[in-house]
């Protein structure tokens, strides 16, 4: 009995000493260095921040130990932390009785070099296993040596054996705890390590290396995509990683306490909260309905016909343009409209980031495609807002939007959402069963026409932020510079023509099925012949109206004539005896409708159907004055950090693209996000105001 007790105590003592050895700090860290480190952190005011990060890690580790989802490495980490905190042998005794032969740990000094084998053969490198998010690494020769730049150096080095990566490499990671923070921090929260490798080179630039939880090294986006595919990971994407050494994961800008603030103006509509802060006064943005996407959907306006031209069934993440039909659509549309496509590189997303705008539009994979929704590299905008944005009050420009974290180049920021409205630019109304509709027009009075994208904001005295200034945005991409034929745009209706009142507009009705529409058309003609419905003309409104109908105003202020029990349409009204209140006329009226007087006093984005679009075609645009998303607050700049891209997501109809914003450079945390309205000076001279962007290349005028 005594021999058995002595043997058990000897085993316990040896294993305790082994754990104590694991917790010994590196010999390279002296007492003076440690004191200096914490003094510097105290001076920077980051002591609380560092321990908060450590505490968060401990809470996660605590939960994993409790529910049994911890990995072997995490079990070892937990024992080391407990041992370092108190070396409580009584608490460890029962745990050490369990079988721990499956855990293999190699302990080496800092100055010793040990081969590290991972999934890729013949790789030799050290592993960074810290509690911090970033680690700086100096490389001399061929072996990197990790030194932390945020917290003290790693207390231990754990090496991994050769294996084939699979779902077990990411098992036990609870990704649902980290969905509303910096998207680039998500891999770090999932036990990935992001190391800066400083190589002795003339440019003295550091290189980024990611370490997977299983020890595999990820040196570029292709290796990241391969790893996520092999492990079947559905909570991480390629754009959650950044190999740009100018992008910091811990760059959090500190702002003054807002006089008025809100943690989420979207009211949980967005997957990421959209914060609001006013540090200048106690005003808030005017009330509006927050919409994640535009309404109504484009496919519904087209009567759910011809929604998608093609769909794919890729299994490689839609990387090969030769096999992906959706990638081919983007390339074909671009090649068709370009006079010469020689020297043009691959079009579309690269690692789920868009480096340059595509003037002819970008086709994403859709709901009909069989490709994996998370691993697909051609699905970005449809995933919605991922960045942490904040609406704030600027000193001179009204409301603006800034990012709360560093953003890499080509990253999707947000879309411009609103209510889709439709007008026609014909001198006479040609209502046919195939006409489209606008349901819920909120601004019948405000409209212009252009072949490209136009932004129109309400004009005020001192600023040009949302709902405060009228801005006309012509094509954000110069078609001429991209080789588009100029003669294709010769017949396009210009904004100047819209303001002069030479063109006449009408609001299209909601399209009905053809069978029902033909019945309604027949009924309308019968009513006109019987005298129940007449056509009346006036100096202000020329259009069909029901007899003895009082003149009323719509919600947007446009004067219309309608019966209390009937709905307004573009082609006529029906008497109360009619079976339907919505009419889609089938024949052109003898009298043209009233001349439209454009005042440009609403927040409106006009959508282009194609470079060949002419004034005879329907004009579709977004009105964000009453309904919209965070994109309605984006300001203008003559030197912007965003560019606009039309993306086809829920339909391939060229009339209904999604208007998306992407970064054209690295944007540091706290920087205001802006885009160029591309206003041509002199186009609307009576509505020009001073541009307040403050850039050296400022044009001084904007609408």
UniProtKB/Swiss-Prot annotation:
A GO BP entry: negative regulation of DNA-templated transcription
Name the domain of life. Eukaryota
Record keyword Cell membrane present: no
The protein in question is named Histone-lysine N-methyltransferase SETDB2
Q: What class of enzyme is it?
A: transferase
Give the UniProt family note. Belongs to the class V-like SAM-binding methyltransferase superfamily.
Q: Identify the residues that bind Zn(2+) 4.
A: 638, 691, 693, 698
Domain remarks:
In the pre-SET domain, Cys residues bind 3 zinc ions that are arranged in a triangular cluster; some of these Cys residues contribute to the binding of two zinc ions within the cluster.
Return the GO cellular component terms, semicolon-separated.
chromosome; nucleus
Q: Which Pfam families match?
A: MBD, Pre-SET, SET
Q: What does this protein do?
A: Histone methyltransferase involved in left-right axis specification in early development and mitosis. Specifically trimethylates 'Lys-9' of histone H3 (H3K9me3). H3K9me3 is a specific tag for epigenetic transcriptional repression that recruits HP1 (CBX1, CBX3 and/or CBX5) proteins to methylated histones. Contributes to H3K9me3 in both the interspersed repetitive elements and centromere-associated repeats. Plays a role in chromosome condensation and segregation during mitosis.
Residues forming the MBD domain are: 178-248
Localization in the cell: Nucleus; Chromosome
Taxonomically, what lineage is the organism?
A: Eukaryota, Metazoa, Chordata, Craniata, Vertebrata
**EC identifiers of the protein:** 2.1.1.366
Listed binding positions for Zn(2+) 2 are 312, 326, 365, 369
This entry's Gene Ontology molecular function terms read: DNA binding; histone H3K9 methyltransferase activity; histone H3K9 monomethyltransferase activity; zinc ion binding
Q: Where is the composition biased (Basic residues)?
A: 511-525
Q: Which reaction is catalysed here? A: N(6),N(6)-dimethyl-L-lysyl(9)-[histone H3] + S-adenosyl-L-methionine = N(6),N(6),N(6)-trimethyl-L-lysyl(9)-[histone H3] + S-adenosyl-L-homocysteine + H(+)
List all Polar residues biased stretches: 550-560
Which residues does the record give as Zn(2+) 1 binding sites?
Answer: 312, 314, 318, 324
């Amino acid at each position: 009995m005594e021999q058995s007790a002595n043997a058990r105590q000897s085993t316990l003592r040896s294993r305790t000493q082994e754990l104590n050895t694991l917790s010994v700090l590196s010999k390279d860290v002296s007492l003076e260095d440690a004191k200096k480190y914490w003094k510097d952190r105290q001076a920077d005011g980051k002591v609380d921040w560092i321990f908060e990060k450590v505490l968060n890690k401990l809470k996660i580790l605590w939960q994993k130990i409790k529910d049994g989802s911890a990995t072997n490495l995490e079990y070892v980490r937990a024992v080391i932390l407990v041992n370092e905190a108190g070396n409580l042998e009584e608490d460890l005794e029962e745990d050490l009785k369990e079988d721990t032969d499956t855990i293999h740990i190699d302990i080496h000094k800092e100055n010793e070099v040990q081969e590290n084998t991972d999934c890729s053969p013949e790789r030799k490198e050290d592993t960074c296993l810290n509690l911090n998010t970033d680690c700086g690494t100096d490389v001399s020769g061929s072996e990197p040596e990790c030194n932390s730049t945020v917290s003290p150096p790693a207390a231990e080095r754990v090496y991994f054996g050769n294996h084939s990566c699979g779902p077990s490499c990411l098992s036990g990671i609870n990704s649902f705890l980290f969905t509303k923070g910096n998207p680039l921090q998500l891999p770090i929260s999932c036990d990935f390590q992001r190391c800066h490798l400083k190589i002795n080179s003339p440019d003295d630039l550091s290189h980024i290396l990611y370490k997977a939880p299983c020890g595999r090294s990820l040196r570029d986006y292709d290796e990241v995509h391969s790893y996520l595919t092999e492990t079947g990971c559905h909570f991480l994407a390629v754009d959650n990683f950044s190999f740009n050494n100018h992008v910091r994961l811990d760059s959090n800008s500190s702002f003054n306490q807002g006089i008025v603030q809100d943690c989420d103006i979207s009211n949980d509509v967005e997957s990421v909260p959209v914060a609001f802060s006013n540090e200048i006064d106690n005003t808030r943005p005017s009330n509006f309905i927050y919409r994640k996407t535009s309404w109504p959907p484009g496919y519904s306006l087209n009567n759910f016909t011809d929604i998608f031209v093609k769909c794919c069934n890729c299994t490689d993440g839609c990387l090969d343009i030769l096999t992906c039909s959706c990638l081919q659509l983007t390339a074909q549309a671009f090649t068709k409209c370009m006079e010469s496509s020689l020297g043009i590189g691959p079009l579309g997303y690269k690692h789920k980031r868009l480096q340059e705008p595509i003037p002819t539009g970008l086709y994403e994979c859709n709901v009909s495609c069989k490709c994996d929704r998370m691993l697909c590299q051609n699905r970005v905008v449809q995933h919605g807002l991922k960045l942490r944005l904040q609406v704030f009050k600027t000193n001179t420009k009204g409301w603006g939007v800034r990012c709360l974290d560093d953003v890499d180049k080509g990253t999707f920021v947000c879309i411009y959402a609103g209510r889709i409205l439709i007008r026609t630019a014909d001198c006479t109304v040609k209502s046919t069963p195939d006409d489209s509709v606008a349901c819920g027009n909120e601004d019948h009075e405000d409209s212009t026409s252009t072949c490209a994208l136009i932004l129109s904001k309400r004009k005020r005295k001192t600023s040009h932020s949302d709902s405060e200034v009228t801005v006309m945005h012509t094509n954000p991409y110069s078609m001429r510079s991209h080789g588009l034929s100029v003669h294709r745009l010769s017949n396009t209706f210009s904004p100047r023509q819209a303001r002069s009142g030479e063109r006449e507009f009408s609001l299209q009705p909601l399209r009905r099925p053809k069978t029902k529409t033909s019945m309604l058309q027949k009924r309308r003609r019968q009513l006109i012949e019987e005298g129940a419905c007449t056509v009346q003309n006036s100096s202000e409104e020329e259009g069909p109206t029901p007899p003895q109908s009082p003149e009323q105003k719509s919600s947007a202020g446009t004067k219309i004539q309608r019966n209390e029990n009937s709905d307004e349409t573009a082609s006529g009204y029906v008497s109360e005896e009619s079976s339907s209140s919505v009419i889609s006329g089938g024949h052109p009226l003898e009298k043209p409708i009233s001349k439209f007087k454009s005042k440009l006093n609403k927040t409106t984005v006009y959508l282009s159907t194609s470079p060949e679009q002419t004034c005879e075609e329907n004009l579709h645009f977004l009105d964000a004055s009453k309904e919209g998303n965070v994109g309605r607050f984006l300001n203008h700049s003559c030197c912007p950090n965003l560019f606009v891209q039309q993306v086809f997501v829920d339909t391939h109809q060229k009339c209904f693209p999604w208007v998306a914003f992407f970064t054209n450079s690295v944007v540091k945390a706290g920087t205001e996000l802006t885009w160029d309205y591309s206003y041509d000076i002199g186009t609307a001279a009576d509505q020009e105001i001073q541009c307040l962007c403050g850039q050296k290349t400022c044009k001084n005028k904007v609408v």
